[in-house]
Swiss-Prot record:
One of its GO terms (cellular component) is cytoplasm. The gene is rpoA. This is DNA-directed RNA polymerase subunit alpha. It is an enzyme of class 2 (transferase). DNA-dependent RNA polymerase catalyzes the transcription of DNA into RNA using the four ribonucleoside triphosphates as substrates. One of its GO terms (biological process) is DNA-templated transcription. It comes from Hyphomonas neptunium (strain ATCC 15444).
């Protein structure tokens, strides 16, 4: 039986898994739709995830450049149409994937005439340029340029001066970096219906990344960061739910209590009728339903949902569980065979 304190979180509706709506470039753009959420939770979760997505995910960026013949960033390079300041701005847009946490060196050598693109940069084996068509500069005929870059990993925004080594050679130009692989995040909260109740939120996250991380993975990592930070505030131990129970004494592979019929749960008439009308016969059928699926059952409301969740919790079970190979063959025969276990 759940306690009053347990009901603080157990009676809240749990949303379905996010639905991913891929953009024209699935590796970079997508919308994630989450519903149903308790009223107000769309804004709460959307704002928290957006802030973490933009500020806290690890990524790679160019943090410094040294150009042959250039002493400082306000110089002009003979035969190069762009000045150094413009080149530095272009370098900030180079999208990079790098697994190592050790800074790496990259080199660019080019001869004119023509555009010099990011794809011409010579990279170590564990570094990849994700937007090779990005134009870095344009060379006139007969001109050439050589640049050496430092690339590193980090999070958030770091100012250029923080990237200047103490032993930096003359001509080394530090670059401020936006490490985050997430380029843009927006969210929208709308009303949504579950069953007959129009009192829930639908959260839509609109995410664009640089391609080093997919939108859905970026949300997963952001959620993991929030989980890790919030865990520190939980000052009590939660009881472990025994989902196996008597299964250890049988060869079923699951708890034989799942073979018990739902009409034996002593539910209210309304809840029992809703389960019957939805062809939910056994507890094993019931626990595999999500809360959202249950609320879509005709005449099934929040009161019935809370009643069922409380009864299942008293048995060490909950909605949304997975039971491999369910339903088993000859389920009625198995129910009689293991009647003493249930």
């Amino acid at each position: 039986m759940t306690t009053v304190n347990d009901r603080n979180w157990k009676v809240l509706i749990r949303p379905n898994r996010p639905v991913v709506q891929a953009g024209y470039d699935a590796k970079r753009k997508a919308k994630l739709v989450v519903e149903p959420l308790e009223r107000g939770y769309g804004t709460t979760l959307g704002n928290a995830l957006r802030r973490v997505l933009l500020s806290s995910l690890q990524g790679a960026a160019i943090i410094g450049v040294q150009i042959d013949g250039v002493v400082h960033e306000f110089s002009a390079i003979p035969g190069v149409r762009e000045d150094v300041t413009t080149i530095v701005l272009n370098l900030k847009q180079v999208a990079i994937f790098m697994e190592s946490d050790t800074p790496k060196r990259m080199v660019l050598r080019a001869k004119g005439p023509g555009e010099v693109k990011a794809g011409q940069i010579e990279t170590p084996g564990d570094v990849k340029i994700l937007n090779p068509d990005l134009v870095i500069c344009t060379l006139d005929g007969g001109s050439e340029v050589r640049m050496e870059f430092t690339v590193a990993t980090g999070k958030g925004y770091v100012a250029a001066e923080a990237h200047r080594p103490e032993d930096a050679p003359i001509g080394y130009i530090p670059i401020d970096a936006i490490y985050s692989p997430v380029r843009r995040v927006g969210y929208q909260v709308e009303d949504t219906r579950e069953g007959t109740v129009l009192d829930y939120d639908k959260l839509t996250l609109d995410i664009e990344t640089d391609g080093s991380l997919s939108p859905e993975d970026s949300v997963a990592y952001a959620a993991r960061i929030l989980q890790d930070q919030l865990q520190l505030f939980i000052n009590f131990e939660e009881p472990t739910l025994e989902t196996g129970g008597a299964a250890d004494e049988t060869d079923l592979g699951f708890n034989p209590v799942l073979l018990k019929k739902v009409d034996e749960l002593e539910l209210s008439v309304r809840s029992a009728n809703c389960l019957k009308n939805d062809n939910i016969v056994y507890i094993g059928d019931l626990i595999q339903k999500s809360e959202a699926e249950m609320l879509r059952t005709p005449n099934f409301g929040r009161k019935s949902l809370n009643e069922i969740k409380e009864v299942l919790a008293g048995m060490g079970l909950h909605l949304g569980m997975e039971v491999p190979d369910w339903p088993p063959e000859d389920i009625e025969g198995l129910a009689k065979k293991y009647d003493d276990h249930i």
